[in-house]
Amino acid sequence: MSLFRVYTRVLELLGKERRLGWTLAVANLLLATAQFAEPVLFGRIVDVMSGNLATGALAPEARSPWPLLAAWVGFGLFTIFCSAAVSLHADRLAHRQRQAVLTSYFEHILQLPTTFHTGTHSGRLIKVMLQGTDALWRVWLGFFREHFAALLSLLVLLPLSLYINWRLAMLLFALCGVFTVLTTLVVRKTYGLQSEVEAQYSDLSARASDALGNVALVQSYVRIDAEVQGLRFVADKLLAAQMPVLSWWALVTVITRASTTITVLAIFALGIVLNQQGLTSIGEIVMFVSFATLLIQRLEQVVSFVNSLMMEAPRLQEFIDVLDEVPAVRDRPNAIDPGRLSGLVEFQDVSFSYDGKRPAVEDLSFTALPGQTIALVGATGAGKSTAIALLHRAFDPQSGTVKIDGMDIRGLTLAGLRRNIGVVFQEALLFDRSIADNLRVGKPDATDAELRLAAERAQALDFIERSGLGFNTAAGERGRMLSGGERQRLSIARALLKDPPILILDEATSALDAVTEAKVNLALDEVMRGRTTFVIAHRLSTIRHATRILVFENGRVIESGTFDDLVAQRGHFAELARAQFMVQEDARASVAAAADHASVRP
């Protein structure tokens, strides 16, 4: 994306503040006009006092400097108050809109599909959010405080200077044009270099975040020195990329100072010649020297702003790229909130592909009656999770229909659909908040009594009450203050509070030891009662009592039936069951043999 396109996108993000933006634009125009009135009055006062009156377009009629001085005071006061008003409202606009865009960005990324979040580090998204909104704030502030005023000053000065003395005006703009061309060349040169600097910054951030996120691994494998050395290597690459940029911007400083000196001297030289020929006055020479100083200052502001924009461009580019990510699904204009559903789920010839080539599920059809338990079995990548994602409407199928209670779920609001579906994940997901706050995710208005009842039904009340703070106990980041079994039971309690008619269990006990699994299974039996339940399982012992088992392979259901029926068919499921139970029997035999061996040792 070009620098100009980044700039226009930044201004588009002003959104509802555009009206105030236009007000500030008018104020900046008045400010630019008033600022150039001061050099004009100064020059005319010099002419009046020297007696060398100009004969040009703005020749003073008064023979006394006092009226001109009074006008100067008036313009000066107007400039002061107008500058204060512009600065105040520009600050408020930039701060207010930064918060609005930050909130909008946060809402947007929460709506993006899980595939996006799986491929994007959460730390990067937070960095992009904070750095991007800060960059937007600085650009907006610079635009309304300096950049816009500088551009308007150029528009005011061009006709004004030509009107006063076109000869001096042509020299002034020729020299400033050279300055602008040289500066533009430097800016173009550094734009690509700055992108490399920001890329190195991202690598540095990712390297540090990666090490800090695995600090236990770093310490246990004695990798502190290695990680520090790795970070230092990336930091050295960053510094090497930064040095050429600094050199080019040092050249800009030299060009700016040289331009100021050369322009003032050139105007004085031409002014002396024109004065000797009677084509200009001393006051006009003074006036154009002031014009030159103001113009160079304004051009410096523009260059400084462009420099700032160029430095911020990679951050802004990242921010805009995330905003341009399209959510996989959205509410249709005529979507309805269905209220509480009964839980009749139908898949009718459903096909879906992530890449448009290889189908993740193909011609999937089945019906789950309210209260039934449907187990999904198959190898990793067989299509189980994709089928559940389609039910949850993380994606829409390319063909076929998913219905609940006879309604196409694409015609339901996302909020209305997902209120009817509860999920217990393989890894219990908890916020870094109190246990009560985590449980109320399922039901925000739940009373303390409801929390206790849900925790009791989920076999979680005992460990909660053993804590000194009870339901106010902090779960820690991602629930790390709790054991795996405790986290999972809280996840089940949360689902009980939500009380959905449809429940999804995604390998809910696969990472637990036998004792903890037994407790969690008791809780799962409680939460599954009376609900349409979908169980994704690799351990077949957990789905023995499922109403129906769907066996997936390459996106298709190749077998369907009860546990005993599928074993009797001697097909793919029977092979899986035989393999798993043989492994379990072998494990038991090994344990027994070890015990016998230990008992006969002298």
Swiss-Prot record:
Please classify the protein's predominant subcellular localization into one broad category. Answer: membrane
User: Which Gene3D superfamilies does UniProt cross-reference here?
Assistant: ABC transporter type 1, transmembrane domain, P-loop containing nucleotide triphosphate hydrolases
Span of domain ABC transmembrane type-1: 21-311
Q: Where is the ABC transporter domain?
A: 345-579
Looking up CDD domains in the UniProt record yields:
ABC_6TM_NdvA_beta-glucan_exporter_like
Which reaction equations make up its catalytic activity? [(1->2)-beta-D-glucosyl](n)(in) + ATP + H2O = [(1->2)-beta-D-glucosyl](n)(out) + ADP + phosphate + H(+)
Indicate whether Protease appears among the record's keywords.
no
Membrane topology per the record? Multi-pass membrane protein
- Output the Gene Ontology terms for molecular function: ABC-type beta-glucan transporter activity; ABC-type oligopeptide transporter activity; ATP binding; ATP hydrolysis activity
The EC number(s) given in the record are 7.5.2.3
Could you tell me which InterPro entries the record lists for this protein?
AAA+_ATPase, ABC1_TM_dom, ABC1_TM_sf, ABC_transporter-like_ATP-bd, ABC_transporter-like_CS, P-loop_NTPase, Type_1_exporter
**Which UniProt keywords are given for this protein, alphabetically ordered?**
ATP-binding, Cell inner membrane, Cell membrane, Membrane, Nucleotide-binding, Sugar transport, Translocase, Transmembrane, Transmembrane helix, Transport
Q: Which Pfam families match?
A: ABC_membrane (PF00664), ABC_tran (PF00005)
**Which terms in the GO cellular component ontology are assigned?**
plasma membrane
Q: How does the record comment on the protein's domains?
A: In NdvA the ATP-binding domain (NBD) and the transmembrane domain (TMD) are fused.
Q: How does it assemble?
A: Homodimer.
Report the family membership.
Belongs to the ABC transporter superfamily. Beta-(1-->2)glucan exporter (TC 3.A.1.108.1) family.
Q: Which PANTHER family match?
A: ATP-BINDING CASSETTE SUB-FAMILY B MEMBER 10, MITOCHONDRIAL (PTHR43394:SF1), ATP-DEPENDENT PERMEASE MDL1, MITOCHONDRIAL (PTHR43394)
Q: Its biological function?
A: Involved in beta-(1-->2)glucan export. Transmembrane domains (TMD) form a pore in the inner membrane and the ATP-binding domain (NBD) is responsible for energy generation.
Q: What is the protein name for this chain?
A: Beta-(1-->2)glucan export ATP-binding/permease protein NdvA
- The organism's taxonomic lineage, starting at the top: Bacteria, Pseudomonadati, Pseudomonadota, Alphaproteobacteria, Hyphomicrobiales
Q: Which gene encodes it?
A: ndvA
